[in-house]
């Protein structure tokens, strides 16, 4: 694997054996002078393919721990919802969570008017978001308000809809059906 661009000491851009671009995470991955051939692939902790260009700058601005927590939430959503999610969910979540942590430190609290609706119309996404937020707060020793559960859930819902999978279509039809019954 050729590592060719440093993002920071632990994150870099690379090309795999097939020439596909990816982002690699690992202790000291970006420390060596670029470019170089990475032969010990066990040094890689995580890889990300199909990264949108606009999200690459986030890798410099968002702390690695926040990024990895966002990726854990995205992984849980992929596993538990058993559907394809937009490949950039991790980046969108990392950006949001980093900003939420900054707002929290400044004492700013944002209200989310759709909280009740999201919780009841998307219970699986809400549960994943709730679990993810509590794990993030525990791991990073931060205190974020429960309103962030809804924001995280909305990112997951958006990631479902951006790929246009059958799960989203069925869910939308179900919601419309329930609303029609009222």
Residue ranges and their predicted role:
Residues 1-182:
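A cross-family "folded-core" feature that marks the main globular domain of proteins
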């Amino acid at each position: 694997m050729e590592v060719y661009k440093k993002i920071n000491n632990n994150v870099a851009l690379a090309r795999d054996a097939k020439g596909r671009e990816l982002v690699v995470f690992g202790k000291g991955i970006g420390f060596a002078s670029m470019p170089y051939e990475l032969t010990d692939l066990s040094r890689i902790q995580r890889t990300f393919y199909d990264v949108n260009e606009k999200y690459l700058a986030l890798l410099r601005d968002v702390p690695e721990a926040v990024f990895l927590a966002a990726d854990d939430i995205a992984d849980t959503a992929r596993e538990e919802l058993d559907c394809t999610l937009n490949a950039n969910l991790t980046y969108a979540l990392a950006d949001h969570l980093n900003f939420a942590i900054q707002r929290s430190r400044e004492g700013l609290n944002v209200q989310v008017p759709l909280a009740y609706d999201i919780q009841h119309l998307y219970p699986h996404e809400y549960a994943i978001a709730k679990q993810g937020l509590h794990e993030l707060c525990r791991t990073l020793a931060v205190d974020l308000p429960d309103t962030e559960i809804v924001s995280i859930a909305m990112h997951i819902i958006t990631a479902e809809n951006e790929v246009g999978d059958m799960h989203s279509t069925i869910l939308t039809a179900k919601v419309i059906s329930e609303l029609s019954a009222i």
